[in-house]
Amino acid sequence: MSFWIVIGILVAIGAWLIGVYNGLVGSRNQGQTAWSQIDVQLKRRHDLIPNLVQVVKDAMGYEQETLIKVIQARNAAVAASGNPAQAGPAEAALTVATRGLLGLVESYPQLKANENVKQLQEELTTTENKIAFARQFYNDSVNNYNTRRQSFPAVLAAASLGFGPMDLFTMPETEKEVPKVALR
């Protein structure tokens, strides 16, 4: 009789471990999928910026320092992609550099009237909005995973099953305001 009780307890523990493991895998996979959605939008942003720089380069001959800052920030952001902890600050620096460039574009009437510049500004704004939505979904997914991982009884098995914490995709406080792009 006690043999069957021990077997029953072992089966219950095994079933519990399987349930915890499968729940954590599902939550972690959702977070990884959400990050890949951010990655797609960041790549789109990284691809748009050289096009914008190329279009404005000729008209902004003596503003080379600004253009160089934008390209350097873009290259740093590309290098940080794939790592949420590094991507946040790198993308924030890219946002600052891009805002500086777009601010200078406003000073050049011929650029403000250029259809290519208008289209690139619009695409950049749309991409920024998509990044914001993807970042929110990712952070919600990571929060769900981390909460599940830290909740009882999963906390008893999560670390031993190889489930470490996931990083949120955060931006510095100075970058939390919406970018303003004038399309006139």
What are these regions (language model features)?
Residues 1-184:
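A helix-centric hydrophobic-segment signal that preferentially recognizes long
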